[in-house]
Amino acid sequence: TIDINLQNAVQEELESTIEKFSADSGVSLLINIKNGEILSLNNFPDFNPNRINLSNTNGRFNRALQANYEMGSTFKPITVAMGIDENIINKEMLFDVSKPINSIRDYHPFIGSLSVKDIVVQSSNIGAAKIAYKIGKKKQIEFFRKIGFFEKVNIQIKEAAPPLGNKNNWGKLETMTIGFGHGFAVTP
């Protein structure tokens, strides 16, 4: 389902962005949200399969399918969706985010409380951690299982990496840190 024109345009943009930010590597993945088809999958550095003997292993590593990444703050909306899906929270609820929880802090500290919406908009780790704790480990695991987070990506490439994370044995702190995208890693 790769669209070669889109693939080439995205590859050029990826290379340009990597150069602009002096990055060592990068990956892009465009998916049709209606049916899950992969429209473009790009890696940099890459290699010419017709001249594989001239490439190094770094160029042959498929970062889109073989590497796992912690999702970080991009995971906060999933935590909120989980809480709403389980009828544990609603968008009007407020959470006090004024004090750190153990080692969990916000990059920009907040005074008082934030709504569920503002926890996502303002990217509050403390707020996402509190929502995740309210959801609880059991429901968190059930939700992850339901959406396939414990499964290897269902793609016809044998090198696809399975998710990383101790899916059967995490405690209170892990439940909270997973709420803002740390402690669990998946392929893009």
Predicted regions and their residues:
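Beta-lactam-recognizing serine transpeptidase/beta-lactamase-like catalytic domain environment
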Residues: 2, 26-73, 78-188
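Conserved, well-ordered alpha-helix/loop/beta-strand core segments that scaffold catalytic motifs
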Residues: 1-26
